[in-house]
Amino acid sequence: MTAQLIDGNALAKQLRAEAAQRAAALTARGHQPGLAVILVGEDPASQVYVRNKIKACEDNGFLSSFDRYPADLSEADLLGRIDALNRDPRIHGILVQLPLPKHIDSHKVLEAIAPEKDVDGFHVANAGALMTGAPLFRPCTPYGCMKMLESINYPVRGANAVVVGASNIVGKPMAMLLLQSGATITICNSKTRDLAAHTREADIIVAAVGRRNIITADMVKPGAVVIDVGMNRDDAGKLCGDVDFAGVKEVAGYITPVPGGVGPMTITMLLINTLEAAERAAEGAALAA
């Protein structure tokens, strides 16, 4: 068996085309979707991610605002800029690129973003609402993973799903979205004893721990769906995920590649979250008129 690829680039292209149409319709009504991105410091990976997000906005008819600050920016100044963006009616989504410099409290910064503009879904109000099944925004990477499962018409309800990784950004919300779709969830991490005992029982594996080759072929049930969220570098400096792709693709039923899998979907769902924020703002403006 050779796994079928879940092509994140192709799915992202389709979803972005749909988002661009909706954005054009909103813009025609005077409500162009707007995303503000803030980058503090010179982290090379963050610079790449931010460039990709800004380009995605520009390519799909979104207004984009990019604030780039030196690493010694004060926390107070950053909070002041977020406050200004919260009050700017042209901006519907605010994204602060992580990680932040150590002297800045990232929790405080994320909580400063207005929940209705928290398109990353990290604010405690949105994280809490996710628990109840009614979030304003789903975190972009888990949301993209769910769209990938949807694209192959996978029957999530009743499936055994193992999420490897328990971060607030991916692992925890991923587990919650799968649970709400009717899956039976096991959450593991890099220190889980006998990880393979859990993954071998899984119909769906989501690898999001940030460790190269943590999932190998002998750990995967034949026919399973394997979604690789990891972003690592191999010995040659080439981008790779958390999954041993060459081995696992001979066992799994479906697999996402790295690159070209989850990555493009994360940015796509950021656009969709921003679009939905703009649509809500437009509805609110119409009701107030």
UniProtKB/Swiss-Prot annotation:
NADP(+) binds at G165, A166, S167, S190. Pfam families: THF_DHG_CYH (PF00763), THF_DHG_CYH_C (PF02882). Homodimer. Catalyzes the oxidation of 5,10-methylenetetrahydrofolate to 5,10-methenyltetrahydrofolate and then the hydrolysis of 5,10-methenyltetrahydrofolate to 10-formyltetrahydrofolate. One of its GO terms (cellular component) is cytosol. Belongs to the tetrahydrofolate dehydrogenase/cyclohydrolase family. Pathway: One-carbon metabolism; tetrahydrofolate interconversion. The lineage of its organism: Bacteria, Pseudomonadati, Pseudomonadota, Betaproteobacteria, Burkholderiales. It comes from Ralstonia pickettii (strain 12J). It comes from the Bacteria. This is Bifunctional protein FolD.
